[in-house]
């Protein structure tokens, strides 16, 4: 959510460049912190699953969601450290990771398949699609800032980062496509 402040600040020319740099540092720090706990939670969840069901990883939709969160954060941090993305790119990808997290935490529960199919909350799908629409609008605003800026969104071509992001979305859509809802 901190990335939203950066994107709106950049889009509407609010705040100074130093303010936006501090926001980007916060996004970086929160992502590092979140990645640490996502990795620990994913590994400990796998250990617990192995003790409970006799398997570490079964490609359950919830497990895939945990993997997508970790991969998304790793991609963003590596792209930033490698110089592939600048401040705007990092914040736009942070919003994309938020969408992945919403999908992984709430949308996957509605698939009615796998070990984690327990969240059949009525009316939640409408709210999920509203969140997706809002976040797509924020990403679009961020990308429009790229088009209007002279410095640009990406420092150098980031084919590797885009490949890995495409992999995350492939895992997400394959998870949805190969799970049946009755």
Which residue stretches match the model-derived regions?
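Hydrophobic cores of alpha-helical transmembrane segments in multi-pass integral membrane proteins
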Residues: 1-13, 22-52, 61-115, 125-182
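Conserved non-cysteine loop/helix-boundary elements of the Radical SAM core domain that shape
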Residues: 19
């Amino acid at each position: 959510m901190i990335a939203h402040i950066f994107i709106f600040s950049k889009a509407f020319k609010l705040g100074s460049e130093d303010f936006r740099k501090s926001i980007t540092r916060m996004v970086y720090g929160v992502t590092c912190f979140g990645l640490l706990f996502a990795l620990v939670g994913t590994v400990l969840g796998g250990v617990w699953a192995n003790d409970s069901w006799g398997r570490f990883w079964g490609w359950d939709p919830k497990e895939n969601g945990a993997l997508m969160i970790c991969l998304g954060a790793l991609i963003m941090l590596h792209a930033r450290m490698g110089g592939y993305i600048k401040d705007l790119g990092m914040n736009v990808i942070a919003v994309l990771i938020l969408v992945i997290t919403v999908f992984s935490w709430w949308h996957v529960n509605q698939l009615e398949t796998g070990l984690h199919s327990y969240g059949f909350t009525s009316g939640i799908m409408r709210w999920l699609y509203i969140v997706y629409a809002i976040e797509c609008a924020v990403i679009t605003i961020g990308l429009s800032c790229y088009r209007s800026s002279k410095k640009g969104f990406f420092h150098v071509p980031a084919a590797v980062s885009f490949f890995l992001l495409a992999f995350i979305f492939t895992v997400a859509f394959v998870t949805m496509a190969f799970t049946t809802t009755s």
